[in-house]
């Protein structure tokens, strides 16, 4: 089946899901749910956690936070994101409540590589249960470019159920844009597990019913 045919099938389901349900007072996200089969959740190979860079950035961007020092800290502040330095991390180590708040509000935590040990020890216990993890950044990386890329990125992960759920955009995006984002998620799953591991695919709005994507295998 050609990629264009797959896109058309996904787009058809998304278009239907966007029309279902009453309008809400808030902008709803659009999600993809991928049900998997023949997956051993006890196997390390099945416990995937991958980054997907969506080709079409949602208007509701993922919140990016940066842990850095020196020039990278300054560049991140210029980019307008929340920034923590070494001293900020050390202060947080005494305040688990604030660490949990940070873990809730930051979808991505980009960490300068030489601060990964400290960030992992302090932030890891709060990020892990939320399916998140600090992302190491080389000291010479262009942090502004990375921030922009991660604003359009989502985690793809398998935890305690044989399925993947990911936000692919918002209801004000076009069905084709959302379909292209959904395809990016599917390609990452297939690259890791193989297409034969995908059982069913659904799309839905936050408060809407799931709509199954026609078979694309």
From Swiss-Prot:
Disulfide bonds: none annotated. SUPFAM superfamilies: Ribosomal protein L1. One of its GO terms (molecular function) is tRNA binding. GO terms for biological process: regulation of translation; translation. InterPro entries: Ribosomal_uL1 (IPR002143), Ribosomal_uL1-like (IPR023674), Ribosomal_uL1/biogenesis (IPR028364), Ribosomal_uL1_3-a/b-sand (IPR016095), Ribosomal_uL1_arc (IPR023669). Pfam families: Ribosomal_L1. CDD domains: Ribosomal_L1. The keyword tRNA-binding applies. Keywords: Repressor, Ribonucleoprotein, Ribosomal protein, RNA-binding, rRNA-binding, Translation regulation, tRNA-binding. GO terms for cellular component: large ribosomal subunit. Binds directly to 23S rRNA. Probably involved in E site tRNA release. HAMAP family: Ribosomal_uL1_A. Belongs to the universal ribosomal protein uL1 family. Part of the 50S ribosomal subunit. NCBIfam families: PRK04203.1 (NF003244). This is Large ribosomal subunit protein uL1. The gene is rpl1.
């Amino acid at each position: 089946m050609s990629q264009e045919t797959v896109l058309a099938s996904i787009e058809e389901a998304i278009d239907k899901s966007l029309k279902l349900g009453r309008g809400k007072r808030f902008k709803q996200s659009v999600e993809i749910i991928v049900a998997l089969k023949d997956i051993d959740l006890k196997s390390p190979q099945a416990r995937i956690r991958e980054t997907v860079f969506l080709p079409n950035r949602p208007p509701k961007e993922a919140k990016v936070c940066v842990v850095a020092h020196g020039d990278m800290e300054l560049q991140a502040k210029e980019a307008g994101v929340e920034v923590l330095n070494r001293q900020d991390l050390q202060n947080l180590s005494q305040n688990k409540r604030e660490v949990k708040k940070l873990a809730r509000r930051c979808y991505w935590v980009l960490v300068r590589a030489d601060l990964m040990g400290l960030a992992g020890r302090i932030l890891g216990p709060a990020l892990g249960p939320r399916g998140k993890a600090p992302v190491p950044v080389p000291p010479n990386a262009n942090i502004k470019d990375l921030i922009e890329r991660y604003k359009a990125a989502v985690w793809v992960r398998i935890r305690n159920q044989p399925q993947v759920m990911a936000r692919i955009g918002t209801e004000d995006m076009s069905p084709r844009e959302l379909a292209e984002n959904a395809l990016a998620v599917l390609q990452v799953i297939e690259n890791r597990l193989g297409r034969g591991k995908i059982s069913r695919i659904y799309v839905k709005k936050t408060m809407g019913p799931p709509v199954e994507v026609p078979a694309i295998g």
